[in-house]
Amino acid sequence: MAKQKALQAIRGMNDCLPSETNIWQMVETVLRRVASNYGFAEIRMPIVESTALFKRGIGEVTDIVEKEMYTFDDLNGDSLTLRPEGTASCVRAGNQHGLLYNQEQRLWYMGPMFRHERPQKGRYRQFHQFGLEAFGIATPDIDAEIILLTSRLWRELGINEFVTLELNSLGSNEERANYREALIAYLLEHEELLDEDSKRRMHTNPLRVLDSKNPQVQEALTNAPKLSDHFGEETQTHFDTLCARLDAAGINYVLNERLVRGLDYYNRTVFEWVTTTLGAQGTICAGGRYDGLVEQLGGKATPAFGFALGIERLVLMLTELEKVTNIRPQVDAYVVILGDDAQVAANKLAEQWRDQVPEIRLQCHCGGGNMKKQLKRADKSGAQIALILGDDEITQEKVMVKYLRGQKEQESIEFTQVSSLLSELI
């Protein structure tokens, strides 16, 4: 019989191995804690949604909907899509369960998203996002508070010196429509300098031309009209107030009038946190205001503001900056078991110690072997100590402690002292 070919993960959809999950768990813990610090509650949405949700929510002429969604028909013939982002799903859930109308809600979520992109460093077809959304607040104080929240994330992760905040306002729908006409007129005058993608976008989503990565296109935009020239008093006051709040809080930012975001639902404030440590894929967090999306998806008109960040990019950044330190090993203490009496007693003792110190990561050796083999396993596990149980130790109600990290001498302690020792390891 021919040998079966080993199956592989789908391109762009990666396994997260035990050597990496400790970093992920550390990042996720910080994200959850900071969201909770600001009064946000977790919401969990399905991975699969109706395709119509994303077409209506994200916009039919966006790259995500046109090129990147994983869409299929189920057995009933319904068109379903693996979620490419979380905001539309969060709004759908809020509308469906009556969470949004005439209420203030602060929600966060975390989980896998899917886009059929060309896999590259920091960009994958299955990727994980942390998202945070605030509903029911139209004033710029929530814009400022959420940006402050993101700034706190970077400080807690130790990367605040390596990120830059870029800020812009897209104005209201009416202001943007007026600007769109002026921009199209300008682009038509300079059409010969545009690449094919920008020529297509000029007629479908002209603001996205501002976001082009083509240097020739950017040069052509040098004298393009500015969106800010079309702002009314209300929009300008909103943005000025936000900037004043950030200034007062000591948050540095760069005004970037070509920052437009890739999703159609944004209005007024948009922002990105960018870094040079990831090369071309430099955005690690982005968001803004989307006051029309709730109504667009069938709810009552509700102001909203939120952001999402890519966890893979964040983990990659932390790793490249060597900020991944003091991560607790998978095992704190390893129980070495030698002799028949020790085999009988070890599990009961280990259960007692786990009861006494619930946070301890205590692993008992399984599979037999002499002391040398077991100590080798203990060292490989990352444990700080080995608790050696032999028949003599069981009789004397003692355990031999071997310190696997550092120079401390081996010692014998009473069973009753073990819980205190384990507590020191946490």
UniProtKB/Swiss-Prot annotation:
Cross-referenced PROSITE patterns: AA_TRNA_LIGASE_II (PS50862)
Alphabetically ordered keywords of this record: Aminoacyl-tRNA synthetase, ATP-binding, Cytoplasm, Ligase, Nucleotide-binding, Protein biosynthesis
Molecular functions per Gene Ontology: ATP binding; histidine-tRNA ligase activity
Catalysed reactions listed for this entry: tRNA(His) + L-histidine + ATP = L-histidyl-tRNA(His) + AMP + diphosphate + H(+)
GO CC, any one term: cytoplasm
Localization per Swiss-Prot or TrEMBL: Cytoplasm
EC number(s) per entry: 6.1.1.21
Gene Ontology biological-process entries: histidyl-tRNA aminoacylation
Family, similarity comment: Belongs to the class-II aminoacyl-tRNA synthetase family.
Subunit structure, as described in the record: Homodimer.
PANTHER family, alphabetized: HISTIDINE--TRNA LIGASE, MITOCHONDRIAL-RELATED (PTHR43707:SF1), HISTIDYL-TRNA SYNTHETASE (PTHR43707)
Name of the featured protein: Histidine--tRNA ligase
Underlying gene: hisS
